[in-house]
Amino acid sequence: MEVSSLGGCNVAWDFVELPSQINENWTWEREALNRFARHGQTGDPIPAPLLDKMMAARNYGAASFFMRQLSFGKIDLELHMHTAAYVDRDIEEVDREVLADYRIPLTETGSSMLRAFSHIFDGGYESGYYSYKWAEMLEADAFSRFASEGIFNPATGRDFRRCILSRGNSRSAAELYRDFMHRDPDPTAMLRRCGIL
């Protein structure tokens, strides 16, 4: 992007994580790992049985983590959208009420995570914490195109650069995404990767 005020992190807040998060996908692809993940002394690639174990363990606890991230987004949006409803309320009560559907029911609960959840009050993520999960969905979906066309397919890489990276905030994130994927975002790839589907 030639205009710095439209590039880098100067894009829609729920689109800013897509470029960085999509890169993480290559670190889980055998074809990519074989290019750089090698033994320091022998130069051998990661043994297939070990890589298989890593892949199998990738989703350990994924459903719990998924729900935890959703709960963070939920409480963040709830408190910012309906602030007046929570003024002078006990923080533990608000936590239990708003997040009941996101937790395993327990007779004893710990202290509210709201006491330490600084993202919802500072750092630019106020009412924007959902963007982490949204970006995860976008990058998993966008990577599905790389996976289907070849993770090192030069044409797909150029298309990603042309449609997403080089455009910055010159057009809406939704338009840029549709330019690359030729459709709206679909959560299926993220749910598959997490082992939920």
PLM region spans:
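Cation-handling catalytic/transport regions enriched in His/Asp/Glu
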Residues: 1-197
